[in-house]
Amino acid sequence: MSSHKGDGNDSMSSDEDANEFRSHIQLPRVDLANYRKQHQRGSSKTNIAKAGKKLKGKSVRFPDSYGPRDTILSNSSTTNNSTESSGSSDEECDDPDSRLPSFKFNATDVKGESGDAHEGSDGSSDGGSDDESRGSIKFSDSNDDSDREDERRSRTSRGSVGSSSSKPLKGSDDVNEKETNLDHDYDPQEGGTDITDQWKRTQSVSSSSKSFDGEKHSGIKGIFRKFSLADHHGAHGFSNDYEEPSNSDTFLGRVLSFGSGGGGGGGLIPGASRRSREKEGDEEKEVGGGGEDDGAVEMKRLDFSQLNNEAKKLIAVHVPEAANMDQSFTYDEPNQSAGSSRNSTAPLINPDNAQEADDDHKHTDDEDQGKHGFYAPNLDYIIRGNDDPEDQHLLLDESGEDGYIAPPKQVHAGVLSSLLKLYQNPQDEKSSASLSSRAPSDGKTLAEEQEFGTDMPYHMPTSSLDFTKLKSGPQKLVNKFTHRSNKPQPGKEAEADDEDEDEENPDQAYEKANLPSFQNARPKAPKKTIDPVNVSSKFHKKMKRKKIQQQKLRITVHISDILQRQRFIMMICKALMLYGAPTHRLEEYMTMTSRVLEIDGQFVYFPGCMIVSFGDAATRTSEVHIVRCNQGVNLSKLSDTHTIYKAVIHDLISVDEASQQLETLVRKKNQYSPWLSVFLYGFGSAMVCPFAFGGGWLDIPVTFGVGLCVGYLQFFVSSMSNLYSSVFEITASIVVSFIARGIGSINNSKTFCFSAIAQGSLALILPGYIILCGSLELQSRNIVAGSVRMFYAIIYSLFLGFGITLGAALFGWVYKNSTSDKKCRTSHNVNDKYRILFVPMFTICLGLINQARWRQLPVMMVISCTGYVGTYFAGKHFSNVPEFTAAIGAFIVGILGNVYSRVWKGMAVSAMLPAIFVQVPSGIASQSSLLSGIQSADQITHSNSSSDSSSSDSSSSLSFGSTMVEVSIGISVGLFAAALVVYPFGKRRTGLFTL
């Protein structure tokens, strides 16, 4: 390997370098004054030489958002060449490459190039090579290829986006890696660099690169280039790969917000517009870097056995005494036996009593765990006591599967209190005898206070005796009567000091382990010799030391257990919100989960957001998390989430296994592609047209075609643009109304029905789901979330009405004799005995669009058809009261769904939701309020309108919103009444998973 010469410093021989496998690069000290003089000598010749080198050499340009890191060390070859030859110093300083931030290398990393270095060392010592005189470093042979590739890419893509200019050099990552490898080898005494000199070099290269970039991309072309490169770099200031930019990174893409995902819709297919063309982002990949050549660490699957070994090593570092203990603390694999989900620390604490702890569900009454300080008092239980009317469980079956779980008297201690307890020293040492006059409560640690705090509900009496005096009293009496001297024997003194070193000076052991200590500073008592007669004290001290070590291990495992449980609670919350769990019962689900896992948690739900607070009673603190997501409906994933939720609640699987299953479920793709969903969208529109809106046989294919257009707008266009998703409902209703009125006007409305085509095509974007959730939340006393959803649903309905009015008016301007019928003729309708055949087909379409499995469809069809029969006959008697018919149909649906959940142990939500969606179009069609704006369209196209008619039309334009509210109120009343009949006392263990 080549050795470098310095100013007065001796270098090692090549044989020594080969033996030690590294080179000691000795860097000279750069003279700042000499550097300035060299710059002041610049003449016209040197300026011409500078310009020529700039044109010949390839300048390294960084993007505007990326600045090279300021390194303390300069390039070894550059600085050595500047001191060895004065003739090449001017060229080196003038060369822009020399101003780049320099790097240092570890010889072990470039060991493969040692042969080339040996060959080039002779030449460089004689005359010096071109590369060394210019101060450039050859990283590897692939750099030349990458430079040629960069030049070719810059020529080909210079006019388009210019993404190659924003990519870092491939060798820069290697340099950064090698720079970090040699940080520990640098000695500032051997050779250094002036920091101001290095700072000036960095500033000069950044300014020169920016000026050169500005000259090259000036004018309109440069402006568009800046727009296209806006926010194109990653979180670290540069892109991770050399691929072409996606649509979301270009100027047009940012205007239309391609790939942003859009917001969730409010129709019968919530979340359909949340699909994106891009892959779902991986947070770990974004943090660690997803490029192949970015030098980031590849994220791999978690190996829990390996983590267990690492945790043991970490404990051994912090607590060295734990290495000599009995290795009885083994990791509990995920495929453990049933009943070990909540007591995951039990095998680590006491393996013999693990089975006993699993058999008893009420872990809070276990006094052994309370002694270890793992539990803290449940403040809610202390405040309200046992007189909570909501927790009366006298009429519930505790022995059954859904047995009642009372609010725990104690919950797991928080993370902060456990950390403080882990790093606090015990206060019951002999050093406390010097301050025996102090009150015992003043010397308590947080661990001792927490142990007393576990018995707060029982108000245990306290004593004012000073037990520290009792400890020293008997010893003084023995010494007094036996007249023994305090002089230790020579052979026993060293042994006694070694035995009691940790006990007499507890801070010294913590200093050895480099642990922080939160103990109050107090004077230490002088060392006392141990009486040889008192042999039993040694045994007690050993046992006490072992007990403290076991307590530290328990606390360490307890902290990881608490973090795992809190993470699972947030994951299950996000999954339930994503896949369409009943929003008015989300707080109940989370409360039940935290109660079973013995976590002190409080939950507040807002639309699209859940605020989670984990309390710590010992430190009077709380940790607040906000879980946000775009809510939608995915019936298959909702069923899987419910299965995982029930398995954890009933102690069938552990928390870590449930977390792994949830992660796998979230990453799983949807069952049906967007193109299939568009086809199902059109098929569903065709099926709902005859039985809900009175369409004929000829209206079915027309409605199918128009429904395909609406489905494409929702699943493709709306999912690619955030801006368009805001006006999707208006544009879809305009297109549908325009096409439907044009087709309905053929042959003077004798062939096709305008109202059936228009309402059938818009049936799947009716605000049925969101207004249903709003009414259920209002009825369950969740005023904030219910009011927000209800008001949004009303405005959403007005959007649809405005779009229908505008589309009909546009066609009225084109064709003066357009139809204005809001109802189909009686002779045009399908016979009533055939309408029931379209209901199961529409139910299948609704289930498949919402990603339901095929095995879930039979139950959906039975419940949906039964509910429609009730609605049909109720509509014959209450023709003008849509809320009555909706309430009767929803009551039937709720009874069947809850019975299915209770008898066959299914999930009522997935079985009831398509049946409820069938009730919404039927209620809307009873008054034809969706086409109430057709009169306003006629008013716009005909100028002879009076003030009376305009006032009546203003009231009719709001009729669609009022009809939606009436239908939703009837549905919510029917659902709550059905839940009351089937579950008169509710489900106190898992929560009622129904609408």
From Swiss-Prot:
Residues 259-269 have a biased composition (Gly residues). Residues 110-121, 170-187, 359-371, 385-396 have a biased composition (Basic and acidic residues). The chain crosses the membrane at residues 678-698, 700-720, 726-746, 752-772, 794-814, 833-850, 858-878, 881-901, 906-926, 965-985. Residues 283-296, 495-506 have a biased composition (Acidic residues). Residues 74-88, 157-166 have a biased composition (Low complexity). GO terms for cellular component: membrane. It comes from Pichia sorbitophila (strain ATCC MYA-4447 / BCRC 22081 / CBS 7064 / NBRC 10061 / NRRL Y-12695). Residues 1-217, 253-299, 326-407, 425-508 are annotated as: Disordered. GO terms for molecular function: transmembrane transporter activity. It is a multi-pass membrane protein. Residues 326-347 have a biased composition (Polar residues). The keyword Membrane applies. It holds the Pfam family ThrE. This is Pheromone-regulated membrane protein 10.
